[in-house]
Amino acid sequence: MSWRWQRWLLPGVVAVYAAMRVYRGAAICMDGDEIFSVGVAAHTWGGLLRAVGQDSIHPPLFYFLLKLWVAIGGDSLFWTRLLPTLFSTLAIVPMVLLGREFQLRPVVISTTVGLAAIHPYLLYYSQHVRMYTLLMLCALTSLWVFHACIRPGRRTEASKFAILTLVNIVSVYSHYYGWLVIGLECWYLIFWKREYLRRMAASCAVVFLAFIPWIYWAGKYIYAKGGLASNLEWIQKPDAGALAWFFVDLAGFGDFPFIGRQAVTGLALLVLAAGYAAWRERAKLHAGHFVYMARFLLYFVLGSVAVAFTASRLLPNSVWGHRHMVYLVFPMLMLVTAAYYQLNSPAVRITGGILCAVWASMVIQHHLKGDDKKTPFDSLVIQMLAQEADNPGSVTFYSVDKYLHYPVWFYLETLKAGKITGFATPLPADRAKLAAGAARIVVRNHVNIEEAKGAHFWVGYSSAWPGKLSPEAILTARGCRAGADVTVRDRYHSSTIFPVWCAE
């Protein structure tokens, strides 16, 4: 491929990258985490700060930006999900600039972006109204500016570190994992570039000073609730299996759980084959900047995973999460793509090409089918209201599940307010009737099944229900009549609601 065509390739793959994220962006309703985001952003500025302080586990920047975003374009599902899509697309810029600093050919950079365009792990969080793509944008920008700081350039050393300081301030206000990136940058200098340590120490001091207001604000709420255990207790400590699955996810096979161990085995064999080919052609790998680039990228990829894994094992509560390290997708893809073009081994070229083609076809087919990781809770609410359309009285909804009440309550409150926030299911034309129906539903949170009483009510539960008998069977044994249920599913769970009539 000529250099002229290589340069035109990048705008094309960027367009595909953006289109893949816009496509079906509003096909499924918001989940509980996204609902929390828009709920926080709906507060006044003071109320937003209090809500984020009470939550404590995420800094406030994303919520500020989401509030401004909604003020500009409204709260429709499509518009709100455009914000993480925008952050994800902007993250291409620092990664391309970093690739150019590594003197990678345009075809290598374009291929990296092309693979990222259809990467399922990255696609999912690019359509998820949370702060993870903002963290990715900040982390990748930090890596690019950090690399520029330790390389000769036209700007002065002081000005480059000043820019890095500003970027890192934004980064730590986007997510606490921003501190992980900063820490790895410091250790990189200790290992390889100690002459820049003084500048970096000053930069870190300024970042810390800028973060003190949030430490004080969140610290008040953390102290009042006795720590962060209530926020983090649901996160399991990672084991070797979780670590292996993270790399399966990072490689782009996480959306295909049916592959299971075969994916891990296949990836291990591919790594071994690539390693053998690299050893055979080690002279070519040492040509140019490949070894330097590989060291830089691998350090941040493996360092991020190692620190997160170790901290999660040692701390009282785990901080492990694939979503927190979505920023590693681009560096990993750049490293693999650069190695692919650097090696001339026919075995690696053919194997890599076949694997990439099979993977791409599976990913595109999966994306065209739609997201199966989120539950269509809005459908539950609409169907419940449809069945209660002729009932003029109030009805209680008992959630015997710990989490189901939250989305049901949110979508009812949204309809009561005459809004469409988070809805993907088509709504009936008579919005006033819909709002009146929603106002008649009273939601009870996480109750015991024995507390579900009345002449007529609804019950909701999920596939996490622990009892031997289903809620329908328990209520039927009590002498009540359970109506036909409404069930919705995602890849991992199902949620069910059903009406009940009991003799008074």
Residue ranges and their predicted role:
Residues W5-G153, E157-A503:
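Membrane-proximal helix-loop-helix interfaces that form the catalytic/acceptor-binding platform
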